[in-house]
Amino acid sequence: MWKRNLLLLILLHIGAFLFPFLTVSKEKLTPERIAVALALLAVVLMSEALSIYLIFKRRGLRLREGLIWILELKEIEYAKLSEEERDLAVKFGYIIIGFPAAGLMLCGAVLEWGDLALAFKFPIIFFAFIVPLLQLCLFPLVVLFYTYNRFLKNDLAASANFSVFWAKLSIAGLVLVLLSLMLVKSEVLPFVKTITAHRTAFILAPLFNIFVGALQYLMAKTGSRELMVTFSIVLFASPLLSFALLLELLGAYSLQESLKFALIGVSVIFLAMFAATWVVLRLFGYSFDTLQRAVEEARVEGPILFWLFWVNAAIVGIGIFFVIRILTF
């Protein structure tokens, strides 16, 4: 099995590194640009190999031994790993995804613009644009996922870990946005005009998500019913600001107009979610009161949780789709 996974990993790298050469127009593929791009790819590959070697060495594993172990790891076995082994697997995943992505972007930027400085600035701009945008698009699903873990599954550890991850991602997004505003002035790079024109929304979006991550973490840790009620009200009101920032960030409306539009959109989505939840509960013979008692007594049936989560997730996803569709129409 590990040989098959290793082959897939090699093919992933080959595909990522060949993609820029196949997509950039032929007139831009000068010998000088190709030479610089190949040198960058060599540096990326050596850095990736060194990173993998070091994470295995810290765990007392040889490179071959570590690769075989991690490439034979199955999804079912992952849940049974110790915290140290899980940390190793996650870091390995970041490395084998991050380095090919970096190689693809750097190589593509060098071939496209022929400027090494711009090539290193492009990933900053790209992720400064994409991280806040994705966070705002996924935010209603994040609230739903957190609610599912915290209140229906009563899994406090998973809720706290997810909150920390969300806050860290938001901090990374904020740093990238600030770096892009300070360092990148060239309008040759894509997304520069969008970020500078809507800098307020790009700064507020990660700050907003840092606050939400901290709020969710406190909800996982607090034992006070009064605080939980207060936090829940704030959390479920937060998609309104999320939608408003998304609309302003995409440049369709001013922030004031976006708030009005978001109020309508969020209200419609929440009403649809409430109605869908009521229908699902009735189909399984529950009401809102009996579901609450069942959760408190830890006797909730698996199928109802499955349908509650995915029906509401579908409603949120469709709602987001229509928002973006309206903006780009």
UniProtKB/Swiss-Prot annotation:
Keywords recorded for this protein, A-Z: Cell membrane, Membrane, Transmembrane, Transmembrane helix
Topological relation to the membrane, as annotated: Multi-pass membrane protein
Subcellular localization, as worded in the UniProt entry: Cell membrane
GO CC entries: plasma membrane
Superkingdom: Archaea
Protein name as it appears in the record: Uncharacterized protein AF_2131
Membrane spanning stretches: 5-24, 34-56, 92-114, 124-146, 159-181, 196-218, 231-253, 263-285, 306-328
